[in-house]
């Protein structure tokens, strides 16, 4: 289970409706997260942005 310093967030693809769920540390990462991950629908790597 996540501690109180970590927050469960979802990452939404910029090119499709694909989503990932992950955990981020609120103290160390104050801004919004952007990661390049594999999109299964498009079958290629795209940028995923943090969504609330």
Swiss-Prot record:
Primary gene name: rpmG
Native source organism of the sequence: Chlamydia trachomatis serovar D (strain ATCC VR-885 / DSM 19411 / UW-3/Cx)
Keywords: Ribonucleoprotein, Ribosomal protein
Protein name according to UniProt: Large ribosomal subunit protein bL33
Keyword Ribonucleoprotein part of the UniProt annotation: yes
Family the entry assigns: Belongs to the bacterial ribosomal protein bL33 family.
SUPFAM superfamilies: Zn-binding ribosomal proteins
InterPro entries xref list: Ribosomal_bL33, Ribosomal_bL33_CS, Ribosomal_bL33_sf, Ribosomal_zn-bd
GO molecular function annotation: structural constituent of ribosome
One GO BP: translation
GO cellular component, one term: cytosolic large ribosomal subunit
Pfam families registered for this protein in UniProt: Ribosomal_L33
Higher taxonomy: Bacteria, Pseudomonadati, Chlamydiota, Chlamydiia, Chlamydiales
């Amino acid at each position: 289970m996540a501690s109180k310093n970590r927050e469960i967030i979802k990452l939404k693809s910029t090119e499709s409706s694909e989503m990932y769920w992950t955990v981020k540390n609120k103290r160390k990462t104050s801004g919004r997260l952007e990661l390049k991950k594999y999109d299964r629908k498009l079958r290629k790597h795209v940028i995923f942005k943090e969504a609330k």
